[in-house]
Design a protein with these regions (language model features):
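Short alpha-helix in the alpha/beta-hydrolase fold that links the catalytic acid
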Residues: 252, 266-276
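Short beta-strand/loop motif that positions the catalytic acidic residue
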Residues: 250, 256-258, 262
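Hydrolase active-site cap/lid region
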Residues: 179-236
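An N-terminal hydrophobic leader/cap segment in hydrolases
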Residues: 7, 11-74, 83, 313-316, ...
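The serine-hydrolase catalytic nucleophile loop
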Residues: 100-113, 126, 268
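Alpha/beta-hydrolase active-site loop
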Residues: 137-158
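Conserved alpha/beta-hydrolase
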Residues: 111-133
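C-terminal catalytic histidine-bearing segment of alpha/beta-hydrolase fold enzymes
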Residues: 281-363
Length: 363
């Protein structure tokens, strides 16, 4: 699917802004304000300092047990940082798509799970994230664009192309993993955790969830017609794809997981599972997270990991209260050294085993 370079030059492209004004009838001042608001939602995300990271969410903590190679691959005009985790004798490979506000390293526990169970893994940082190029993350369709290019890179790579491919994504990575099924027919299985259905309509749906139905503007005076036009210019035909269309376009096994108390991607509003009645295929397995697994991120982890995460946050908060100030880097690092990183990031074994079983049954 074709891409464009609007992510690089739209800020200074008066012709594009003029086209939006002509098409929408909006005043230039309104367009500039709306654009600034939109762009503020999608900044660049840098990797946090390791002393602020709890859990095995940094490669330095697992490198003795998990081999990987790094490389760059193109996504339109951008170079994305890719990571390959080999597994001896593996004939299958899982492509892992990270969530927003995160990067590839934040899914190392899941990468390790697949590698230790016989799969090679390909992961990458999305545009505007961690080690990849890009001044911003651009929009909600970005992970789909990046995954499309990642799969094209794999298809044309002499060594990577020999693997049977599987997809695993979380949140906006789950949206990408399911939506891309419309474009790539060599995928053998797909698992999406807490995915939303459409990157194109998500902002509108979030606005409707909190402010009710509206005709002309989003919350904060965000013009709806600007939003539609701007995203169409940024992402072109990618805006026409969504998870339901992707799932309905294939008969490969698909695993959809979502927590009932997900306050990021609402179980009842934006989620793929809320569109269950639109899915015609019988190839979908649903996993509903409840209790400790009901949240957007807690669905990923074991019950004891979730309990330990709460304990660590409580202890950190208490330490800050005792100091009556923000901790210094040295104090934060000292606290971090006493955290059981393995326990903190332990995966939801029930869910991951179900995904693994589904993948293992695929040809």
């Amino acid at each position: 699917m074709g891409t464009n370079e609007l992510g690089k030059n739209l800020l200074d492209n008066a012709k594009i802004l003029g086209r939006i004004a002509l098409t929408t009838g909006l005043q230039m001042g309104t367009i500039l304000g709306a654009k600034a608001l939109y762009d503020s939602f999608f900044p660049r995300y840098e990797k946090r300092d390791i002393y602020t990271i709890f859990g095995e969410f940094d490669y330095s903590r697992v490198e003795k047990d998990l081999t990987r190679t790094t490389f760059f691959f193109p996504s339109g005009p951008w170079k994305l940082q890719g990571y390959f985790y080999p597994c001896h004798g593996a004939k299958k490979m899982v492509v892992i798509c990270h969530g927003m506000h995160a990067g590839a390293d934040d899914y190392i526990p899941f990468i390790a799970y697949f590698v230790h169970n016989g799969y090679a893994v390909f992961s990458y940082d999305c545009q505007g994230t961690y080690a990849s190029e890009g001044d911003s993350t651009v929009g909600m369709c970005t992970p789909l664009v990046n995954l499309d290019h990642a799969l094209n890179y794999i298809k044309n790579h002499r060594q990577l192309s020999r693997f049977k491919l599987f997809l695993f994504g979380h949140s906006w990575g789950g949206y990408a993993a399911t939506s891309v099924l419309s474009l790539h027919k060599n995928i053998c299985g797909c698992a999406a955790v807490a995915p939303f259905n459409s990157g194109y309509t998500l902002l509108v749906e979030k606005g409707e969830q909190y402010a009710g139905s509206f005709k002309d503007s989003l919350v904060g005076g965000f013009p709806k017609n600007f939003l539609e036009m701007y995203q169409a210019l940024l992402f072109k035909d990618y805006t026409k794809l969504d998870a339901v269309k992707g799932i309905n376009s294939t008969d490969v096994p698909v695993f959809i997981a979502h927590g009932t108390q997900d306050f990021v991607i609402s179980f009842h509003h934006q989620s793929v599972i809320s569109h269950k009645d639109e899915i015609r295929q019988n190839n979908v397995t649903y996993y509903v997270g409840t209790g400790a697994h009901a949240g957007h991120n807690t669905i990923l982890h074991s019950e004891r990991a979730v309990a330990y995460q709460k304990q660590v946050e409580k202890e950190l908060k208490l330490l800050k209260k005792e100091c009556d100030r923000e901790l210094t880097q040295e104090e934060h690092a000292a606290f971090c050294r006493h955290v059981d990183h393995t326990l903190y990031s332990e995966v939801n074994a029930e869910m991951m085993q179900a995904i693994l079983d589904m993948f293992n049954q695929c040809a």
